[in-house]
């Protein structure tokens, strides 16, 4: 028996994977702005563009009209999942507001800072929907393809609203997916943003053949950078040793399905950033938000040498091996 109505906004790899999981238990509607993609999904029961080879559940429905999708998740016992990238979150919030169809409860799954404003996702939502309160972030170590295949995964929903946490738990906590709850929205979002930048660093190190010792050092010292920035922005230190901090960092920094790690590997091989991004075909949020992370860190007086090295390679033309050498030349310090 289908137990609740859920609308998923965004039919990329992650939105499709989450919708596939939800549709096993719930009346789930997957929205995409591209009507041709919606028709293709309905006809093939497969998202060949973003998640090829994964059969989608027969009960999953598809929609190209945003108002219809939002109407599906209006009730107090429903849930809306925003699966757009950070760059599209603000526009979707405005569209919900302008349509006067803001869902009672919604969560977003994007990770990063808005490039031009340096806002975290919850700050964008608060600016666009100031009269709404029941929302939060769903995050954690997860690759879309594995979720779509029904492999085990653990995620965290963080929200100031108990009702939002309860709705999200009721929607997602079944099968091979385990959901934890909390209220440290800032900590969860900072972890999700910074780990993408750090994954580029580990990709560079692995691509240069620097070994597993170097990878371990980058992950642990990167975690220290993440925690320092997160605490400076109002997050709690313990959040960064959990799923959305250390867990997500380990996965993104070491997993072969990681787009950000792939960017680092290819930079180490001598490819230009423009060529890498053109060939990737998907979002690499670490590239998008690296400047914002470093800018905020400098503004707050937070030392983030690994992030600085990544930005030097991405944007200043510094050779990957020279950036690593710069890190090794840093003065010794207490841990």
UniProtKB/Swiss-Prot annotation:
Q: Which domain of life is it from?
A: Bacteria
* Annotated binding of sn-glycerol 3-phosphate, by residue: 111, 140, 142, 195, 248, 258-260
Q: Which UniProt keywords apply?
A: Cytoplasm, Lipid biosynthesis, Lipid metabolism, NAD, NADP, Nucleotide-binding, Oxidoreductase, Phospholipid biosynthesis, Phospholipid metabolism
Q: GO biological process: what's one of them? A: glycerol-3-phosphate catabolic process
Q: Name one Pfam family in it.
A: NAD_Gly3P_dh_C
Gene Ontology molecular function, alphabetical: glycerol-3-phosphate dehydrogenase [NAD(P)+] activity; NAD binding
Q: Does this UniProt record's set of keywords contain Signal?
A: no
The pathway noted for it is: Membrane lipid metabolism; glycerophospholipid metabolism
The record places the active site at 195
Q: Catalysed reaction per UniProt? A: sn-glycerol 3-phosphate + NAD(+) = dihydroxyacetone phosphate + NADH + H(+); sn-glycerol 3-phosphate + NADP(+) = dihydroxyacetone phosphate + NADPH + H(+)
Compartmental location: Cytoplasm
Q: Does the keyword Magnesium apply?
A: no
What InterPro entries does its record include?
6-PGluconate_DH-like_C_sf, 6PGD_dom2, G3P_DH_NAD-dep, G3P_DH_NAD-dep_C, G3P_DH_NAD-dep_N, NAD(P)-bd_dom_sf
CC terms in the record's Gene Ontology section: cytosol
**Record: residues binding NADPH:** 14, 33, 111, 144, 259, 283, 285
HAMAP family named among the record's database cross-references: NAD_Glyc3P_dehydrog
- Provide the function of this protein: Catalyzes the reduction of the glycolytic intermediate dihydroxyacetone phosphate (DHAP) to sn-glycerol 3-phosphate (G3P), the key precursor for phospholipid synthesis.
Family label: Belongs to the NAD-dependent glycerol-3-phosphate dehydrogenase family.
Protein's name according to its UniProt entry: Glycerol-3-phosphate dehydrogenase [NAD(P)+]
Species the sequence originates in = Burkholderia mallei (strain SAVP1)
